Amino acid sequence: IDSSSFMFQEAMSVLDNSKESDSKFENLAEYWDDGAGYSGTPTGHFFTIAHQLVVRQGLKLDEALELYVKLGVAVNEAFISAFRLKYKFNFIRPITYIHRYIDPQFNTRIASPPFPEFPSGHSFQSGAATEVMKSIFTDSISITDSTNFNRTDIDGAPRTYSSLTEMSEEVSISRLYGGIHFKETLDVSLACGRK
């Protein structure tokens, strides 16, 4: 294997970030994991964020309805697009590549999904969701996400962001810290979702 190749370097980035002992990385990966049964998956997490903004900003019923409809369409279209591309490209997951070429003992911080790696559904839908919220609230709105505040299995303390862009970037990078996506995938997926 060519250790100077782009793919090898991407895999090493996943490996290094996954093994980093900094609890911040682990907390981010777990906070944005959004497994079923906790926040209703990534889409559910973004709907709870939207609801927090609706309440905080005092949106009227018609304004809230517009946000929820646009958000629902955007995240569903994002996931449809992402999964079409996943099976078009059928790209290998970091865990598979790392096991095969670097470290057969490697394990991810969060569960590695049983479908192709590229693009990242979380990043794709995060980009789409935050673009919708920006169209209603502007990007510079600060947000404190308390979606996971009552969870005891992870550090669910509310997370505060100075902008929606900052939040979407954290959602995206959390997948690298979880060990389930390559950095290049995250960057491309977030950019696609924003379009």
Predicted regions span which residues?
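Acidic/polar surface patches and capping/hinge elements
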Residues: 1-195
